[in-house]
Regions:
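Bacterial Sec-dependent N-terminal signal peptides
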Residues: 1-26
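Glycan-recognition and catalytic cores of secretory/periplasmic carbohydrate-active enzymes
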Residues: 23-213
Length: 213
């Protein structure tokens, strides 16, 4: 009986070992499909807006005021002034573009650079260079702390993936402008210059500091 039990236990152990060794391999094909879809969308966008000298910011969508009130547990009178106007019917689902001075302007060229890095697709690289160069005037801009977002995502990735002699100068000049927003008395970088704020400082400042190093 003991021998039978031992044999059964041995057999179960062997089956467990074999099953552990023959686990199916993870299917990562969905990653490639996602990357292919993202790359195609990035290229399509690049082609469609190339003559505008603008950058894609978001897709225009509407909002349900009742839903917002339920989520915020507040009356709409307390926050409706802070909402953007509802897009018109012909604007819904369309791209919202922005100028090079918008705080999100570096994200699109940055996305092109990352897609190029992952695919090796030279068409993506060409578009990345074009949309990065579009941000050249930002090197003279002093009106926001978001210079890190704007320039690191674009020129920072360009320096990493396709370096040339002009990129470092753009990044240094922009970094100098970001340093210029530092106030010795307060020991902080001023976040922005609009509105009625005295000296706004938000956590995003930390994410822009990488440009200084």
């Amino acid at each position: 009986n003991n021998m039978k039990k031992n044999l059964v236990l041995l057999a179960l152990g062997a089956l467990t070992f074999v099953s552990c060794q023959t686990q199916p391999k993870e299917d990562y094909s969905w990653i490639k499909k996602g990357l292919d879809a993202a790359s195609a969308q990035l290229q399509l966008t690049a082609e469609e807006i190339s003559s505008t000298n603008m950058l894609p910011r978001s897709i225009r969508t509407g909002y349900d005021m009742n839903f917002l009130c339920r989520q915020l547990e507040r009356d709409s009178l307390t926050f409706k002034d802070s909402l953007r106007a509802q897009p018109t019917a012909d604007q819904l689902g369309k791209r919202r573009l922005c100028s090079v001075y918008d705080w999100t302007s570096g994200f699109y060229p940055g996305s092109l650079w990352y897609a190029y890095e992952l695919t090796g697709n030279d068409t993506l690289k060409t578009w990345a260079i074009q949309y990065t160069n579009l941000l050249n005037p930002v090197r003279y801009y002093t009106g926001t702390h978001d210079l890190g977002f704007m320039v690191n995502c674009s020129y920072g990735n360009a320096e990493r993936l396709a370096p040339n002699d002009t990129i470092a100068a753009v990044m240094k000049e922009t970094a100098d402008n970001l340093c210029g927003r530092f106030n010795d008395s307060i020991s902080a970088i001023r976040s922005w210059d609009f509105g009625t704020w005295n000296f706004p400082v938000i956590i995003d400042n930390m994410m822009n500091l990488d440009l200084l190093f």
